[in-house]
Amino acid sequence: MQTKKLFGVKCMYKNKITQALLLGASLTVAATSFSSLAADIPAGTKLAKKQELVRGNGTEVASLDPQKTQGVPESHVIRELLEGLVNQDANGNTIPGVAETWETTDNKTFTFHLRKDAKWSNGDPVTAEDFVYSFKRAVDPATASPYSWYLEMTTMKNADEIIAGKADKETLGVKALDDYTFQVELETAVPYFVVMMGHTTVKPVHKATVEKYGEKWTKPENFVGNGAFVLKNWVVNERIEMVPNEKYWDNDKTVLTKVTFLPIENQVADMNRFLAGEIDFTYEIPNEHFRRLQKDEPESLSIKGDLCTYYYIFNTNKKPFDDVRVRKALSYAIDRDIITGALLGQGQKPAYFLTPEITANFNPVTPAYGKLTQKERDAEAKRLLEEAGFSKANPLKFTLLYNTSENHKKIAAAVQSMWKKGIGVDVTLENQEWKTYLDSKDQGNFDAARAGWCGDYNEASTFLTLMESGNTTGGIHYLSKAYDALIQKAIKSTSDVEREKIYLEAEALLTKDMPIAPIYQYVKARLVSPKLGGYPVGNVEDKIYSKDLYIKE
């Protein structure tokens, strides 16, 4: 999922998918049942009389339609309003959502048994047909979902043909066996399929509401959801407010009485509002204030691993970025140690690969160029540029695009300086607001651009499928039959060991072709009120459910 966030590193939390259903390729029925989690309040905790949460959310959301979003800020809000088949606990483990239990005998056909007390906010029951409708809507070309490929990646039956316009959406491999039994058929076995069902794109929508109001169904006065909260107010570029959904099946355990999301793009403003007591946790923090916050606000400063990678993409459809020598030269000349150590300094690690080290069942290998000194990398970069026809007399010139953010600006300026001083490249910086920036990348209107990706689930394929041919999400236009073959081979494998081996081959191919320049692995650094209970420090996907939170005295 595309991200506006900034920080990243390896941390102590390397979540493993522990359920046998999710990791194993067993041919026996694997049924899963858990006790649901809502605000788990330790004995003796004194709650504040006012249970209203205010949080920074980085930017104004582009949409609240789960089948039409692609960003992290949107997912944070939608997670409160709509509930999918599964959720996550505070440590990132998959737990029941609308589905109470599920089973499979071959990791190709999955049957989900829905809870009968799940209801929409208007009182309608949540049924298997709601999921059938929503999944078909996600792959329907008429919806134009920027994440339709996600269902194709699951190998859901006929998803690829439907998305390509070669088959009717009604042929998608989903069916309602009865009102409360939802079944999904895959083309190939995917042992981690249930984990993938926690994604925003596969959350259900209320058919009657969508069809009645069209694009306006997400307005507060029209919105019907099945999540723990309902949309109360949405003032664009100011705030999104929600209150508990009285029809939610587990509403009795929800403690908060109101949740407000603020689209604060400026990290200093976000920090200052926290310090003034106006918000309970920030979206992120300004890097230049990090050391001061370490000293002055140690109880509020939270740093945890984040399943995300920060990188620059090259538009391989434009000259000279169709030349691998140019792409490699630019990547080599980025001093990642300076960026992570001097510029950021919050625990981020240099990235020489796309998939973060904290990804479950994945142990990346640093490529040869990552083991060189920066002086050696710069020398090789100069040689490559000269081979590609560039010199002091004919310097490489281009524009680097980034979305509006002081932190992104600082990194872009630092890299601009590295490219100029290290290898004589002239770069112009251009910033755009989030929605415009997304459009520019999607339409290929850029030379090189800042990008970031956060895992949609905790498995390496969530990163590596991003680079498949035909997947232009985030503006990537990498074409490699060899790479595609590796990813398809990995998806069909039910062995963790075999998949990791294939993933390492795929990473090696990305190093060889360099369609992107990995820069660093994130951490999630933010200010969190000591009075906030239930904050999920162990969730590396940063999936926060307000139904699990509470405010202490």
Model regions and ranges:
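Ligand-site clamp/hinge motif
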Residues: W217, K247-R292
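Aromatic- and charge-enriched surface segment that lines or borders ligand/interaction sites
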Residues: E100-Y150, Q183, R273, P320
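Periplasmic-binding protein-like
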Residues: P141-A142, M197, S302-I303, N317, ...
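Gly/Pro-rich hinge or "lid" segments in bacterial periplasmic/extracellular proteins
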Residues: N93, M156, D160-E161, G165, ...
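N-terminal lobe/hinge region of extracytoplasmic solute-binding protein
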Residues: G56-D106, V224
